[in-house]
Amino acid sequence: MNLNIITEKDKKQSYNLNKLQKRLRRNVGNAIADFNMIENGDKVMVCLSGGKDSYTLLDILLNLRLNAPIHFDIVAVNLDQKQPGFPEHILPEYLKSISVDYKIVAENTYGIVKEKIPEGKTTCSLCSRLRRGILYRTATELGATKIALGHHRDDMLETLFLNMFYGGKLKSMPPKLISDDGKQIVIRPLAYCKEKDIEKYAVAKQFPIIPCNLCGSQPNLQRQVVKEMLQKWDRQYPGRIETMFSAIQNIVPSHLCDSNLFDFKRIRHGKIPEGIEGDIAFDKEAFSPTPLVQENDEKIDFIQGEMISFKEVN
């Protein structure tokens, strides 16, 4: 009797994991297609930190590649920054176990940061710049055409509010960008993925997670406050997070105040410039009492063998 109960439980867990994986595959596949992140013949360098996000990114990309209508290569790269207590064996052992090409880059950025930054000050800014430079260099050495990072939808929304609250900018994380020197293209294939989905997936797949607090730096309190704010909104107002993410995909420049984005000076009597969307000078916009975008992913049953649509390069 107990064996039957365990069997049914295992079946349910397997079914739920299958649904979750297909949802993540669909979201990643859609992001890749919408922003033309990966093209035929690309060599994608997946930056692997040992956290849940980068593990999930690598796993889903490897899974998608099996049925993709284009060919692309994947190489995983980890930057060992020589932080005290960093378990150097975990990532090589894991990457060997899944038979993926990989490179471990050892650079003592930890020592440099500790030398340059006074005790008690945040080290994140300098550490980030050093890490970025090393990863760009490594991509060039490996012949990688794309650099894939594990930032997800929640990261992008948090960054949007951080820039509004503390930077005075309407700016988020782009799903795809080019480096200042024009030599590297960075992509974020998890852009449409929810953090809670990634957390569940990482637990179910039993990824060997490496703690993210080894450097001993102060936590980013501003980001944590914004994260908690968004989580509270998500609990109190279901659908609000999805609507906000939809908003950063539907920008109306003529109804903001950035004269660099929209030329307000060319507005003249008798002429309607392109890009203006509706006259609401005296009218208040009417909104639905509930968010227009509702997340239905939890209710979706995916078709077995579902194909993900990539944009193939001619």
Swiss-Prot record:
Transmembrane segments: none
Residues spanned by motif PP-loop motif: 49-54
Cofactor comment: Binds 1 [4Fe-4S] cluster per subunit. The cluster is chelated by three Cys residues, the fourth Fe has a free coordination site that may bind a sulfur atom transferred from the persulfide of IscS.
Coiled-coil regions, chain positions: none
GO BP, sorted A to Z: tRNA thio-modification
Keyword tRNA processing part of the UniProt annotation: yes
Cystine residue pairs: none
A GO-annotated cellular component: cytoplasm
Residues that coordinate or bind [4Fe-4S] cluster: C124, C127, C215
Swiss-Prot/TrEMBL keywords: 4Fe-4S, ATP-binding, Cytoplasm, Iron, Iron-sulfur, Magnesium, Metal-binding, Nucleotide-binding, RNA-binding, Transferase, tRNA processing, tRNA-binding
Location of this chain's protein in the cell: Cytoplasm
Cofactor field: Mg(2+); [4Fe-4S] cluster
Assembly and oligomerization: Homodimer.
HAMAP family the UniProt entry points to: TtcA (MF_01850)
PANTHER family recorded: AMINOTRAN_5 DOMAIN-CONTAINING PROTEIN (PTHR43686:SF1), SULFURTRANSFERASE-RELATED (PTHR43686)
Miscellaneous field: The thiolation reaction likely consists of two steps: a first activation step by ATP to form an adenylated intermediate of the target base of tRNA, and a second nucleophilic substitution step of the sulfur (S) atom supplied by the hydrosulfide attached to the Fe-S cluster.
Protein name: tRNA-cytidine(32) 2-sulfurtransferase
Organism of origin: Histophilus somni (strain 129Pt) (Haemophilus somnus)
Designated gene of the protein: ttcA
